[in-house]
């Protein structure tokens, strides 16, 4: 059985975020989430209150941001 294209995109984005040194957390945030740094650590929070499509958009936007900052290769 082949993996759904949306899940492939999700997995690729999360892998890229992790490779950039971010800890990925999936939490119920009521509409929040994204990249942040505190306590000397880097985090990506994915809001489980959002739909998979919204979470995917959030993750892919984080990847774009990391690419713009040079933390992920193109």
Residue ranges and their predicted role:
Residues 64-74:
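Catalytic Zn2+-binding segment of zinc metalloproteases
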Residues 28, 47, 67:
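His/Glu-rich zincin catalytic helix
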Residues 1-33, 38:
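Auxiliary, metal-adjacent structural segments of Zn-dependent hydrolase domains
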Residues 55-66:
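Short alpha-helix carrying the canonical HExxH Zn2+-binding catalytic motif
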Residues 2-4, 45-57:
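Short pre-active-site segment immediately N-terminal to the catalytic Zn-binding motif
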Residues 41:
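An anion-binding catalytic pocket shared by soluble metabolic enzymes
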């Amino acid at each position: 059985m082949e993996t759904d294209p949306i899940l492939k995109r999700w997995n690729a984005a999360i892998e890229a975020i992790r490779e950039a040194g971010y800890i990925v957390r999936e939490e119920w945030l009521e509409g929040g989430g994204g990249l942040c740094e505190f306590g000397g650590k880097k985090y990506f929070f994915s809001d489980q209150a959002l739909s998979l499509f919204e979470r995917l958009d959030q993750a892919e936007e984080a990847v774009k941001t990391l690419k713009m900052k040079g933390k992920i290769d193109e």
